C-alpha cells in the first residue's frame, strides 16, 4: 500500500470531498496549466496503417466502401496517406473540418477508384440497396466512411485528478492550499497502487483507478491518429507528461476518458460539451486516513474538519484518523509541528 496526498483550499469543494468521499476529474480548461491534458493529434506517414484502415467495417452498411471500390488497393492507401500525412488537429477539433478541407482531393481519388472498379468488374453492387447511386454519390459515401472511421481514432475527451507524493512542498501549499491556510488529505491506495471509485453516490460497484506517475519533459506531445484508431490503445503518455518547470509537484494522477459516438462526431466540427457533474466520483470511506493542516489554518477550522472526519471514521474499522499540524520555518521549509491519532 502507498500514500498519496491531495492539496485543498478551504471551500465548499473540500468539505464535500471529506463529507461525501468525492473526487473530481478536471478538464484541460479547468487546470492551471493550459498545456496539461493537451496534445497534438497528427497523421504520420504510414501507408500500411491506411491499408488496414480501409478494411475496417463501418457502423452503417451504406458506408461500406467495399460495395463501391477495391479496398485492398495499395494505390488507394498510398494516395490517402499522401493527402493526410503531416496533417494535425487543433485541441477539441473533430476530424470533420480536416476532411472538409480535403473534400475535392478525396472526391477525385474516390471517383477514380470507383470507375476503376467498374471497368475491372472488381465489384458489383447490383444486389445492394445503394446500386442506383451515381458515381459522385458513391464518392460522397466513401468520404463519409472515411470521416466516421477516422473519428474513431479521435473520439475521446480526457480528464485527470491530481495527487502528490510530497505533502510538505512550500510551493504547493502556496498555490493549491490558499497560501498555507488549506489542508492536505492523506489517501491510502490499494496494494496495486490504485483507488476504488464509483461514478454515482448510490452505485454499489467500485472500479479500481490506477495512480500513474507524471513525467516531466519539454518534448512536444503528439499522438498518431492512425495508430491509436487501429490499436485502440488508451492514450497515456501524452496525458502523463508535463513541462519540466512543474517537476517540483511530484504528481501522480488518475485518468478518466469519455468516448463519443463516431457517427455523431462525423457531423460535428468540435467535441461535445459535457456535464461536469458526471465527473464527480466517490471513493471508499476508508481511503482517507488522515489530514495535514496548513501553517495558517485557524484552530476553529481545524476543529471543524476533525469533527467531520471523526464522525465519518466512527462508522468504519479501524476507527480514527491521523491529524498533523505544520509550520513554515524561517528558511522557507514546511515541517510537521505536531501529530496525533484522533478517535
Locations of the language-model features?
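Partner-binding and oligomerization surfaces adjacent to conserved cores of proteins
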Residues: 1-343
Amino acid at each position: 500500500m502507498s500514500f498519496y496526498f491531495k492539496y485543498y483550499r478551504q471551500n465548499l469543494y473540500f468539505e464535500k470531498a471529506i463529507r461525501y468521499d468525492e473526487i473530481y476529474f478536471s478538464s484541460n480548461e479547468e487546470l492551471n496549466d493550459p498545456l496539461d491534458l493537451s496534445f497534438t493529434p497528427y497523421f504520420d506517414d504510414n501507408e500500411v496503417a491506411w491499408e488496414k484502415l480501409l478494411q475496417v467495417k463501418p457502423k452503417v452498411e451504406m458506408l461500406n466502401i467495399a460495395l463501391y471500390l477495391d479496398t485492398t488497393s495499395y494505390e488507394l492507401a498510398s494516395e490517402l496517406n499522401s493527402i493526410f500525412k503531416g496533417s494535425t488537429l487543433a485541441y477539441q477539433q473533430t476530424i470533420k473540418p480536416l476532411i472538409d478541407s480535403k473534400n475535392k482531393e478525396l472526391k477525385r481519388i474516390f471517383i477514380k477508384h470507383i470507375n476503376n472498379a467498374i471497368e475491372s468488374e472488381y465489384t458489383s453492387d447490383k444486389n445492394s440497396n445503394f446500386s442506383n447511386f451515381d458515381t459522385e454519390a458513391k464518392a460522397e459515401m466513401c468520404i463519409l466512411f472515411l470521416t466516421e472511421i477516422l473519428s474513431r481514432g479521435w473520439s475521446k475527451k480526457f480528464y485527470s485528478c491530481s495527487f502528490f507524493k510530497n505533502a510538505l512542498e512550500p510551493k504547493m501549499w502556496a498555490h493549491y492550499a490558499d497560501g498555507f491556510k488549506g489542508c492536505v488529505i492523506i489517501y491510502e491506495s490499494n496494494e496495486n497502487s490504485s483507488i476504488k471509485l464509483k461514478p454515482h453516490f448510490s452505485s454499489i460497484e467500485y472500479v479500481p483507478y490506477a495512480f500513474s506517475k507524471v513525467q516531466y519533459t519539454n518534448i512536444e506531445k503528439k499522438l498518431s491518429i492512425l495508430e491509436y484508431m487501429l490499436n485502440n490503445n488508451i492514450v497515456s503518455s501524452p496525458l502523463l507528461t508535463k513541462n519540466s518547470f512543474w517537476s517540483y509537484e511530484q504528481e501522480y494522477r488518475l485518468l478518466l476518458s469519455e468516448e463519443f459516438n463516431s457517427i455523431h462526431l462525423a457531423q460535428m466540427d468540435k467535441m461535445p460539451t459535457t456535464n461536469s457533474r458526471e465527473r464527480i466520483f466517490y471513493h471508499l470511506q476508508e481511503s482517507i486516513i488522515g489530514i495535514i493542516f496548513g501553517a495558517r489554518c485557524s484552530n476553529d477550522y481545524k476543529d471543524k474538519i476533525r469533527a467531520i472526519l471523526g464522525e465519518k471514521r466512527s462508522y468504519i474499522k479501524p476507527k480514527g484518523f491521523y491529524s498533523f499540524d505544520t509550520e513554515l520555518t524561517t528558511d522557507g521549509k514546511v515541517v510537521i509541528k505536531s501529530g496525533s491519532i484522533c478517535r
